A protein has these predicted regions:
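Short coil/turn connectors between adjacent alpha-helices in alpha-solenoid helical repeat scaffolds
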Residues: 62-73, 106-119, 153-167, 200-214, ...
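Conserved alpha-helical positions within TPR/SEL1-like repeat arrays
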Residues: 59-67, 93-110, 139-154, 186-204, ...
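Conserved positions within tandem-repeat grammars
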Residues: 116, 127, 139-142, 163-166, ...
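Hydrophobic, helix-forming membrane-interacting segments
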Residues: 8-48
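Flexible helix-coil transition and linker loops at the boundaries of alpha-helical arrays
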Residues: 47-49, 82-94, 111, 129-141, ...
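Charged/polar helix/coil "stalk" or linker segments at domain boundaries
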Residues: 42-116, 158, 162, 209
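Leucine-rich solenoid repeat scaffolds
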Residues: 317-320, 324-343
Length: 343
């Protein structure tokens, strides 16, 4: 497994070279937790032993574990625990473990065996939802529905795009019945961000303008909660997604106007994604900015915008070196050379 830069990161993982809307996916997954050190007490009663051996920590601790590339280690614990915990005798704990299993499989899908791991994630989330009903556990229900929607959206990038996106929309709609802006602002914002990404993905196969406009509306809803002052990383994620969406919309109408909006959105993201704090997010966003300036050069101020594009690509290459990120290095270098030739 590749080592990550020893810099502070946002937790945002990119989906390889897939859709640009796969930004903030992992942070959009809700409700993960990690099991701490397993201490074995021999009391003769197996269930008592398991219950006393389990130590659940916070979502932040789970994120830190996964940030250390310990996804498979976490999954091993979840799987062992779920095989011992009774869904009947301790339903809530069982559902928590299944939800966390789903998060692990989702994250593993970013690394390997994409389709197989996404299908395992879906199965785990569906198992959790047998217990996490809207009536008994409304918040947990919404969390897992959001996770399920995100996973179906990811699966749509692999196969059966329309079919899986339909399932994603259904899951997000269920989550938003619980996650209202007034009562659950963070869940509302996360789900709106994910909903926007789903509409953007759908725009690739049908009703491009209409679905991109729906995506923009959803991202703007998310930004009503995800302000830079209160939730800077969520703000940056959604602004970057918004910038990508405006760039896509520029291919349909008002090219100059929508590209200008894209520039502004991406620049907002870069107020948070700095080179020192979030190098990978910085590089990805600088690459996006370079692409926007390259497109804008086709409309106005050709030399000026191409120069800005080259500078943005050069910034991205401060992170995307040939030795550490060869595929990104080659892609960004090719875009930069093209911009230089067009000047």
């Amino acid at each position: 497994m590749k080592k990550r830069p020893k810099k502070k990161k946002s937790g945002t993982l990119k989906w390889g070279n897939k859709s640009p809307w796969f930004i903030g996916i992992v942070s959009g997954l809700i409700g993960a937790f990690v099991v701490g050190a397993v201490l074995y007490y021999f009391y003769g009663h197996r269930e008592l032993e398991i219950y006393r051996a389990i130590s659940m920590t916070s979502l932040n601790n789970a994120d830190r574990l996964l940030e250390k590339n310990m996804v498979e280690d976490a999954l091993t614990i979840y799987t062992a625990v779920s095989s011992q915990v009774s869904a009947k005798k301790d339903a809530a704990l069982y559902a928590n473990v299944k939800n966390s299993e789903g998060v692990c499989y989702y994250k593993l899908a970013l690394i390997k065996n994409t389709e197989a791991n996404l299908l395992k994630a879906i199965s785990a989330f569906q198992e959790a939802l047998k217990i996490r009903t809207q009536e008994k556990y409304p918040t947990d229900y919404a969390n897992t529905q959001n996770n399920l929607g995100n996973t179906y959206r990811a699966l749509s990038e692999v196969k059966d795009k329309k079919q899986n996106l339909t399932k994603a929309f259904e899951a997000f709609e269920k989550a938003l019945k619980i996650f209202t802006r007034d009562k659950s602002p963070l869940g509302y914002a996360a789900t709106q961000n994910n909903l926007g990404a789903a509409y953007a993905t759908l725009s690739e196969v049908m009703d491009k303008e209409r679905n991109l406009n729906k995506a923009i509306k959803a991202f703007q809803e998310a930004l009503k909660v995800r302000t830079m002052a209160r939730y800077p990383l969520g703000y940056a994620t959604t602004q970057n997604n918004l910038g990508n969406t405006y760039r896509a919309l520029a291919e349909v109408k008002d090219k100059g106007g929508n590209l200008a909006k894209a520039v502004q959105a991406v620049k907002q993201a870069l107020k948070v994604y700095t080179l020192s704090e979030y190098p990978l997010d910085y590089a990805a966003t600088k690459n996006n900015l370079g692409n926007v300036y390259s497109a804008l050069a086709e409309v106005k101020d050709k030399e000026e915008n191409l120069t800005k594009a080259v500078r943005a690509y050069e910034e991205a290459l401060k992170v995307y070196t040939l030795g550490r990120y060869p595929s990104q290095f080659r892609a960004v270098t090719a875009s930069m050379e093209k911009a230089k030739k067009m000047r």
